Structure formats: structure tokens, C-alpha cells
Amino acid sequence: MSRYQATNEPTERERAKAERREALLREATRLFALHGYAGVSLEDLGAACGISGPAVYRHFAGKQAVLIALLVDMSKDIYDGGLKATEDGGEPMEVLARLVDFHTDFSLSRPDILQVQDRDLKSLPKSELQLVRKLQNAYIGLWTAQLAKLHPEATAPSHRFRAHAVFGLLNSTAHSAHSPRTKKSGMKALLTQMALAALATPVG
């Protein structure tokens, strides 16, 4: 190992700090989903991670900074995942199938963060809200580009409406997945089948 590589490895203290930050983000996601952003204090967040409320300031400037990190990072993750799903190209339905696969996996594995976005997005400052909206629009564009190829006779607003309808279907699991009566086994297959049918249905 070179001297350069050695000096760029994180120290034990840096690793511990990074782990604490990730723990705070995980607990914030859970607490915001359960109680809403307004219903959670820094003291609540710190207690969930075994630290005091003021100790949270070592990692974030405040509660709003936690929300910013959660929702901006989530929007980047979704866009990056969608971009990766389209990289190999192919027929429109093939690309859309990969997008559906990615989005369904995301909604089933991270229902809490989707619930936080749905309820607390408007609590972001204006600049961060604009960034999230920009990333969301870019992600929608990945879908509508394929829908335009699949349904060339339809209008751009129609493609956007269809994409949003599918998002509504897939994101609904962010709420139903919390129910103890809901079995995730078989849920992905059913959601995928329904989403693909909605995307493929010819324009009336």
C-alpha cells in the first residue's frame, strides 16, 4: 500500500462518525414516517440513537438538515437507479420493464422514506425543494421517453399522466407494506404485472 493510500483511509474516529450519521438518518426515516417531521424533535432523534439531542448537532446543523439529507439523497438514488435501468437500451417495453423492476424493489424495500417524501416534502427549504423537483422530473423523463416510443400517437401530457399513475400504484406499497396483514411474498409479481399492463395499454 502506498503512503498516499494509507493516509486516505478513514480513521477509526471518522468511521464511527460516519456510522453514527447513518444511524441518525435511519432513525429519522423511521420516526418521520411514524410521527411526521413536525412531530419529531432532535431529542427524540438523539434518544433513538442513544445520544442527547444537542449531540445531533455534531452531525447535522438541525432537524431540517436531516430532512434535506434524507429527501435529496433519496431523489438522487431514485434517479441514478432509473438511469442505470435504461443504460442497456432495447425495445421500449424492455426498458420500461427494467424501470418497473427497479421502482418496485425501491418501494418495497424503502417504504418509510417514500412516506416521508409524500408527507413532508414541502418542509424542505425552497432551494432544496427545487433540487428534488428537478431530480423527480428527470426521473419521470426516463419513463416518458420510452412511453413516447411505445405510444407515438399519444401526447406528452398523456405520457406523463401514465407514468404518474404507475408511480401511484407502486408507491402505494409504502403504506400497505407497514400492515401486518400484508404479505410481501407475491406482492412484487402482482405489482409488476399491473404496472406493465398499465404502461402497455393502447391509448383509447
Question: Which positions does each model-derived feature cover?
Answer:
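Amphipathic alpha-helical segments that line or abut small-molecule/effector binding pockets
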Residues: 26, 93-108, 160, 164, ...
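Short, structured motif recognition centered on aromatic/hydrophobic residues
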Residues: 32, 78-79, 96-100, 116-117, ...
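Short secondary-structure transition hinges
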Residues: 104-141, 175
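Hydrophobic/aromatic-rich alpha-helical bundle segments in the mid-to-C-terminal region
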Residues: 114-118, 129, 133, 148-195, ...
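N-terminal intrinsically disordered/low-complexity leader segments
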Residues: 1-19, 203-204
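Alpha-helical DNA-contacting segments of helix-turn-helix folds
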Residues: 67-74, 117
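Amphipathic alpha-helical linker/stalk segments
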Residues: 72-97
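Helix-turn-helix
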Residues: 12, 20-23, 27-65
